[in-house]
């Protein structure tokens, strides 16, 4: 009979209950009136300590606790693949349908669908003898993976009944087994297994078959074995964040620095602090702007985040944008293809000069803003910010000054002053006087109440020229109001250069200049900003050019409207081929297609004509009305630690930056998941921030399985347990994931399990241990941290599975560690390194130099090199180990020589050592460096890897021979084959790469003849 008790104490995720006589360790219980899911982790008499997997806020002493009689288990059967679960295997999509985006407490749902029918094909017949692990049937779970229905461990006997081939739910009995004792066991298509107990197998095999990933630095230098264990550090510093001075457009606060936004919202909701990171899930989401369905529109931000980064990337563009983000923050590039506008997310560290990034051209929306007039009693004021008030503000901000009791506007254009005076009378019922003050005319309006009203709108009383910024109310207004302000402001501080066909506005206020670009975006106008220094003071030139832009402000320009700024990256060739229309038809529309086929950029106005002909009007009139592609002119790495910030939005992007830009709200793990020759992938997002996990949930479904062309999700199970979910569920998620991986291993599949990150899991152990008041170990982690980590990684392995037939399966575990500040000496990393056999050390310096994968060849290691050597020698090349070791020796020697070069310079080295530097550089650039975004180089099969290595080793051996015979190194460096070796990674034909060996030998033979050697 299940135990029934009462809560006597609640402390965070831990609940203590008494009256639990008969309960067992690790038994699942239902806690409180809501029936929250928990697990007993300590028993003392009839008292039970329970870790609760849901938020415990509101639980009170006296509420009931009821045992279930079963331990924390997972359901294993058809329906696992493509699923997304939380840490205790609740299907998130089903929970969302039941309770919305925020999961209600006490809610549960079966992990596997009960009503879905699966096509079952029997593999045994009545009378067959079976044991645990035997396959009794198959189900095509996805188009990639066949699910093997197995006899659960511990059951054996004779098949007395088996279902015919057909459609069945997992709840239907598909077989009956008569055990030796005469008991009849009914088998369904699914089974349950406790997550803290490893699934049994017959025999553990040595890890001697490599898990081929197609990544040269891994497969050749630091191989992972099937059934092996590896660790990789998470991204250095923080995630996808921006600099604290980044402006962000909000409805509540106007244009505000993101660090100031964080301070305003800090703690206004559920706050979480972990190490140097902190974030708040907002009680009341704020409104920002983002890219959605081809337009820039209002969206909600639900979280604000603050962290730290060890370095930043600063990107400058042609229009004057300056973007400072973390290296892995994503920006948007794109181009128009025959399928429409294709936007691609590119990490900042991959951006280079000449690239074009998507920025904001037009921000939709806006409504008349109601003004707070409650404190204004002595003058009349408009109830809303209308066109006339906006125009008046333009005159005041452009040429005005607020004195204690007077509004003064200075301009020698008397008609402008009269217009401002007319508006003052109409809007406020006060009139001024136009006077001559030395060299300039002035409109003086004596009204302290008007001064107070204008200050309330944010217009500074002193030093206005350097400190003014665009009022929040203007940024939220409709285009007609914005246009009235802009035209008035230009009349004061602007200048139309007829010869250049552009309007130039000069201001001393940095925030004012950037605010103007946001206002112009409300009109669909883009501008450029340039800085200039006059008499030691910095000024900002806001330049509006282009016929279309000027016409939106009522300025007629006769000159050609092509500015070379608003150009559209177009895949003209593919569109032209798909179109199948003659050249003459396009020429008739004024489109010289040959110019664009040869690489000339197409202006937006030309693209509009082109789009009409090729059926892409929606792209031209919707998407490209709202974004343009700004050219990157400079990229710098800033090597200094600093605070960084982020927000979470529904669109995973937001409008921000000094000028309106689209900003995003990791490649190594994606490459491993996509290309490794594991058949099933289990990804555990353990304690990652919500927006980082969202990236995974978005990116994995987009990845294609390279072998079948089908979505990678068809062979993937995702477990999403973010850092704002209860800490106890984070602890359980690791066990849930490894149990699911073992189940697919038992079918005979090779499984890759990726845990991101085990550091967050260890932090969950630390928090629970602290609440249990256990004796702490190093840095507050529990004393049993090492044994728990070992227990997890030891469940990896390549095994002979249970069952009558010989079946081999494997679970390879790759755990990400996220040490604060990249500190590899902290306890989680050190204890992990004692257990795992492979460590891929990510190097921030390599990432800065755009060397990817950024795995450091001097600090990484693999203890599987000896074990997988025979496989490489038998299946690929008997020289693999010799070449690999020689290459490693050269790279290590290069590091030693570089220390000498730093002191005495390269010229002091002997020829042979300079030759080593040359070949080591070729190894780094032509072999280790690999382009994840290149169609060919993204995956390098084993045969290609050894062929490339043989080419490089041939070049090395011939170089050393030539040097010993007196050939100058300068002559060797000039050999034409070097350039071809540099391109071989992009060559798909292995025979063409192999031909470089003969070419290398021929060119060295000629060189030796030339020098008579």
Curated annotation (Swiss-Prot):
Gene name of the record: atpA
Gene source species: Pyrococcus furiosus (strain ATCC 43587 / DSM 3638 / JCM 8422 / Vc1)
Protein name (database record): A-type ATP synthase subunit A
InterPro entries reported for this sequence: ATP-synt_VA_C, ATP-synth_a_Xtn, ATP_synth_asu-like_sf, ATPase_a/bsu_AS, ATPase_F1/V1/A1_a/bsu_N, ATPase_F1/V1/A1_a/bsu_N_sf, ATPase_F1/V1/A1_a/bsu_nucl-bd, ATPase_F1/V1_b/a_C
BP GO terms, sorted: intein-mediated protein splicing; intron homing; proton motive force-driven plasma membrane ATP synthesis
Family: Belongs to the ATPase alpha/beta chains family.
PTM annotation, UniProt: This protein undergoes a protein self splicing that involves a post-translational excision of the VDE intervening region (intein) followed by peptide ligation.
GO molecular function terms noted in the UniProt entry: ATP binding; endonuclease activity; proton-transporting ATP synthase activity, rotational mechanism; proton-transporting ATPase activity, rotational mechanism
Function description: Component of the A-type ATP synthase that produces ATP from ADP in the presence of a proton gradient across the membrane. The A chain is the catalytic subunit.
Documented EC number(s): 7.1.2.2, 3.1.-.-
Complexes and interactors: Has multiple subunits with at least A(3), B(3), C, D, E, F, H, I and proteolipid K(x).
Cysteines paired by S-S bonds: none
Pfam family, one: ATP-synt_ab_Xtn
Topology of this chain in the membrane: Peripheral membrane protein
PANTHER family xrefs: H(+)-TRANSPORTING TWO-SECTOR ATPASE, V-TYPE PROTON ATPASE CATALYTIC SUBUNIT A
Keywords, sorted A to Z: ATP synthesis, ATP-binding, Autocatalytic cleavage, Cell membrane, Endonuclease, Hydrogen ion transport, Hydrolase, Intron homing, Ion transport, Membrane, Nuclease, Nucleotide-binding, Protein splicing, Translocase, Transport
Subcellular location: Cell membrane
Catalysed reactions listed for this entry: ATP + H2O + 4 H(+)(in) = ADP + phosphate + 5 H(+)(out)
DOD-type homing endonuclease domain residues: 392-525
CDD domains on file: ATP-synt_V_A-type_alpha_C (cd18111), ATP-synt_V_A-type_alpha_N (cd18119), Hint (cd00081), V_A-ATPase_A (cd01134)
Miscellaneous remark of the record: The intein interrupts the ATP-binding site.
One Gene Ontology cellular component: plasma membrane
């Amino acid at each position: 009979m299940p135990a029934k008790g009462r809560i006597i104490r609640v402390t965070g995720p831990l609940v203590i209950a008494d009256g639990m006589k008969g309960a067992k360790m690790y038994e699942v219980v239902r806690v409180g009136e809501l029936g929250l899911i928990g697990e007993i982790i300590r028993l003392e008499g009839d008292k039970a300590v329970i870790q609760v997997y849901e938020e415990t806020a509101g639980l009170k002493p006296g509420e009931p606790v009821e045992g279930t009689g079963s331990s924390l288990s997972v359901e294993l059967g058809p329906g696992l693949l493509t699923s997304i679960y939380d840490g205790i295997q609740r299907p998130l999509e089903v929970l969302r349908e039941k309770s919305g985006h925020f999961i209600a407490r006490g809610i549960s749902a079966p992990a596997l669908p009960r009503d879905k029918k699966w096509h079952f094909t029997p593999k045994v017949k009545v009378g067959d003898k079976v044991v645990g692990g035997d396959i009794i049937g198959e189900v095509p779970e996805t188009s990639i993976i066949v699910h093997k229905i197995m006899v659960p461990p511990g059951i054996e006997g004779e098949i007395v009944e088996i279902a015919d081939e057909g459609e069945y739910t997992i709840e239907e009995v598909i077989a009956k087994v008569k055990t030796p004792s005469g008991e009849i066991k009914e088998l369904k298509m699914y089974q349950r297994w406790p997550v803290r107990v490893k699934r049994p197998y017959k025999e553990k095999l040595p890890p001697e078959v490599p898990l081929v990933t197609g990544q040269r630095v891994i497969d050749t230098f630091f191989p992972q074995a099937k059934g092996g264990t590896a660790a990789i550090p998470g991204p250095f510093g923080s995630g996808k964040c921006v600099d604290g001075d980044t402006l962000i457009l909000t409805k509540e606060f106007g244009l505000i620095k993101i660090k100031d936004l964080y301070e305003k919202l800090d703690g206004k909701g559920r706050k979480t602090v972990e190490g140097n990171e902190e974030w708040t899930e907002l009680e009341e989401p704020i409104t920002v702007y983002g890219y959605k369905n081809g337009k820039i529109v209002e969206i909600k931000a639900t979280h604000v985040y603050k962290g730290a980064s060890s370095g930043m990337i600063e990107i400058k563009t042609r229009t004057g944008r300056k973007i400072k983000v973390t290296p892995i923050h994503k920006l948007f590039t794109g181009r128009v293809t025959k399928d429409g506008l294709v936007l691609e997310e590119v990490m900042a560290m991959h951006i280079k000069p000449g690239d074009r990034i998507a920025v904001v051209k037009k921000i939709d929306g806006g409504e008349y803003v109601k003004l707070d007039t409650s404190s204004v009693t002595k003058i009349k004021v408009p109830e809303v910010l209308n066109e006339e008030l906006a125009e008046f503000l333009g005159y005041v901000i452009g040429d005005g000054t607020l004195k204690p009791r007077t509004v003064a506007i200075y301009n020698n254009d008397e008609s402008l002053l009269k217009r401002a005076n007319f508006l003052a009378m109409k809007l406020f019922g006060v009139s001024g006087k136009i006077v001559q003050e030395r060299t300039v005319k002035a409109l003086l309006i004596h009204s302290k109440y008007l001064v107070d009203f204008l200050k309330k709108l944010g217009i500074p009383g002193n030093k206005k020229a350097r400190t003014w910024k665009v009022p929040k109310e203007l940024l939220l207004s409709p285009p007609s109001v914005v246009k009235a302000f802009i035209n008035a402001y230009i009349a004061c501080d602007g200048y139309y250069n007829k010869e250049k066909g552009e309007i130039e506005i000069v201001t001393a206020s940095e925030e004012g200049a950037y605010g103007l670009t946001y206002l112009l975006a409300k009109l669909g106008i883009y501008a450029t900003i340039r800085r200039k220094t006059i008499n030691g003071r910095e000024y900002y030139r806001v330049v509006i050019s282009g016929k279309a832009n000027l016409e939106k402000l009522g300025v007629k320009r006769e000159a050609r409207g092509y500015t070379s700024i608003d150009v559209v990256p177009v895949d003209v060739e593919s569109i032209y081929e798909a179109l199948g229309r003659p050249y003459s038809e396009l020429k008739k529309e004024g489109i010289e297609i040959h110019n664009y086929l040869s690489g000339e950029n197409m202006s937006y106005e030309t693209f509009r004509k082109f789009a009409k002909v090729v059926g892409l009007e929606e792209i031209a009139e919707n998407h490209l009305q709202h974004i343009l592609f700004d050219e990157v002119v400079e990229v710098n790495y800033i090597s200094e630690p600093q605070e960084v910030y982020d927000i979470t939005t529904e669109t995973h992007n937001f409008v921000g930056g000094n000028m309106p830009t689209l900003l995003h709200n990791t490649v190594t793990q994606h490459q491993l998941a996509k290309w490794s020759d594991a058949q099933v992938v289990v990804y555990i997002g353990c304690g990652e921030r919500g927006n980082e996990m969202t990236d995974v949930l978005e990116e994995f479904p987009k990845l294609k399985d390279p072998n079948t062309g089908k979505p990678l999700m068809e062979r993937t199970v995702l477990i999403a347990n973010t850092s704002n979910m209860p800490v106890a569920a984070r602890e359980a998620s690791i066990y849930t994931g490894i149990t699911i991986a073992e189940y697919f291993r038992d079918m005979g599949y090779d499984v890759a399990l990726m845990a991101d990150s085990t550091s967050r899991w260890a932090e969950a152990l630390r928090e629970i241990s602290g609440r249990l008041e256990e004796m702490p170990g190093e840095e507050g982690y529990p004393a049993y941290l090492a044994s728990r980590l070992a227990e997890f990684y030891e469940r990896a392995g390549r095994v002979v599975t249970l069952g009558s037939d010989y079946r081999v399966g494997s679970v390879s575990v790759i755990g990400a560690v996220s040490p604060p500040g990249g500190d590899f000496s902290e306890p989680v990393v050190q204890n992990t390194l004692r257990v795992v056999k492979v460590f891929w050390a990510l190097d921030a310096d390599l990432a800065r130099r755009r060397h990817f994968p950024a795995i450091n060849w001097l600090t990484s290691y693999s203890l599987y090199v000896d074990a997988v050597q025979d496989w490489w020698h038998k299946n690929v090349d008997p020289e693999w180990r010799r070449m690999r070791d020689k290459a490693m020796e050269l790279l290590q020697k290069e590091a030693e020589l570089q220390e000498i070069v730093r002191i005495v310079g390269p010229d002091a080295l002997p020829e042979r050592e300079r030759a080593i530097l040359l070949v080591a550089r070729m190894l780094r650039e032509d072999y280790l460096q690999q382009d994840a975004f290149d169609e060919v180089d993204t995956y390098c099969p084993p045969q290609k890897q050894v062929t490339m290595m043989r080419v490089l080793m041939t070049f090395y051996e011939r170089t050393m021979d030539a040097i010993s015979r007196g050939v100058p190194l300068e002559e060797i460096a000039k050999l034409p084959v070097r350039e071809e070796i540099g391109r071989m990674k992009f060559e798909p034909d292995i025979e063409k790469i192999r031909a470089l060996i003969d070419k290398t030998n021929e060119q060295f033979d000629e060189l030796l003849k030339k020098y008579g050697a």
